[in-house]
Amino acid sequence: MVTEKKTKKSHEGINSRLALVMKSGKYTLGYKSVLKSLRGSKGKLILISTNCPPLRRSEIEYYAMLAKVGVHHYNGNNVDLGTACGKYFRVSCLSIVDPGDSDIIKSIPGDQ
């Protein structure tokens, strides 16, 4: 029960930092634009939802490894990630290009 509280609190922390990135930073949403930002080495952090297809996930992780960018597996499905971004559509993956006023890159180093 204690671990459930901790994960919920960290989940809320990620959501609030993500909302701040959406307001003050630069980001790209979607698979193709995430790969473009990784190939151009513009992305600083990649977030992937839990129900992103395995082939896409492994390809994003591979490009992120080549670009030395952190990858965070978001603890929710693509509907949850879209809602956390303040969008009314599903988001399977997103790349943070410029965090703006948020400290999301320091707080989430990535799962590498």
Swiss-Prot record:
A molecular function (GO) term: mRNA binding
Region forming the signal peptide: none
Gene3D superfamilies in alphabetical order: 3.30.1330.30
Keywords: Ribonucleoprotein, Ribosomal protein
Domain of life assignment: Eukaryota
One GO cellular component, as annotated: mitochondrion
Keyword match Ribosomal protein: yes
Family the entry assigns: Belongs to the eukaryotic ribosomal protein eL30 family.
PANTHER family: RIBOSOMAL PROTEIN L30
Protein name: Large ribosomal subunit protein eL30y
Species whose genome carries this gene: Arabidopsis thaliana
Gene this protein is translated from: RPL30B
